[in-house]
Amino acid sequence: MDLIPDLAVETWLLLAVTLV
């Protein structure tokens, strides 16, 4: 589970910003 940590974090951040 260490293939795309940065990508996952960025995706979650974008999702959070979109939701908020």
UniProtKB/Swiss-Prot annotation:
GO terms for molecular function: metal ion binding; oxidoreductase activity, acting on paired donors, with incorporation or reduction of molecular oxygen, reduced flavin or flavoprotein as one donor, and incorporation of one atom of oxygen. Keywords: Endoplasmic reticulum, Heme, Iron, Membrane, Metal-binding, Microsome, Monooxygenase, Oxidoreductase. It is found in: Endoplasmic reticulum membrane; Microsome membrane. GO terms for biological process: estrogen metabolic process. Disulfide bonds: none annotated. One of its GO terms (cellular component) is endoplasmic reticulum membrane. It is a peripheral membrane protein. It catalyses: an organic molecule + reduced [NADPH--hemoprotein reductase] + O2 = an alcohol + oxidized [NADPH--hemoprotein reductase] + H2O + H(+). It comes from the Eukaryota. Its EC number is 1.14.14.1. It is an enzyme of class 1 (oxidoreductase). 6-beta-testosterone hydroxylase. Induction: By phenobarbital. Belongs to the cytochrome P450 family. Its cofactor is heme. This is Cytochrome P450 3A5.
